[in-house]
Amino acid sequence: MNSIVNITPIIIILSEHSSEHTFGFNSDIFEANVINILLLLFGLIYVLKQSLGSTLNERQLKVLAAIQESEERLEQASSRLSESEKQLAQTQIIINQIKKEAQLTAEKVRSSILAQGQIDIERLAITGKSNIETAEKQIRRQIQQQIAFLALKKVTLQLENQMSSDIQLRIIDNNIAKLGDQL
């Protein structure tokens, strides 16, 4: 309102100056609707400021929620990874124990074989080797299963983190197209 009071002397000067040069300027503020235009302009600025402010606040809240959700998923993935690493370490310990036990068993078998004679040595050596191979095969199988399990778990975690809806739709469309070709 203070700016309107400051504008009034300028308008009066312009109207006096314009009357000398045949340029018409209406100095009556009420007749020229200057107040209405200013009120409309200030109202429009106020409404737009509130509208844009609330929109920006909503967008900020959405971004913060998305960041928080991503951080939670990262924490979950990290805890799963550390758990998998612990399981792998435990598996390595078990493998080492089994190897030590196999070595101890082999040494005991060798001692008893030497005491019983050459014939028993050959027979027990064959049996011992067979047992060791079987144990190694089982251990290898268990290790392979554990490694495959951990690898699948890691790949699953990576797929869950990287798989977007666009990729899923492309995979589904590709499979549908393949089925259509087969029919």
Curated annotation (Swiss-Prot):
The chain crosses the membrane at residues 28-48. F-type ATPases have 2 components, F(1) - the catalytic core - and F(0) - the membrane proton channel. F(1) has five subunits: alpha(3), beta(3), gamma(1), delta(1), epsilon(1). F(0) has four main subunits: a(1), b(1), b'(1) and c(10-14). The alpha and beta chains form an alternating ring which encloses part of the gamma chain. F(1) is attached to F(0) by a central stalk formed by the gamma and epsilon chains, while a peripheral stalk is formed by the delta, b and b' chains. In plastids the F-type ATPase is also known as CF(1)CF(0). This is ATP synthase subunit b, chloroplastic. It is a single-pass membrane protein. It is found in: Plastid, Chloroplast thylakoid membrane. GO terms for molecular function: ATP binding; proton-transporting ATP synthase activity, rotational mechanism. Belongs to the ATPase B chain family. PANTHER family: ATP SYNTHASE SUBUNIT B, CHLOROPLASTIC. The keyword Cell cycle does not apply. Pfam families: ATP-synt_B. Keywords: ATP synthesis, ATP-binding, CF(0), Chloroplast, Hydrogen ion transport, Ion transport, Membrane, Nucleotide-binding, Plastid, Thylakoid, Transmembrane, Transmembrane helix, Transport.
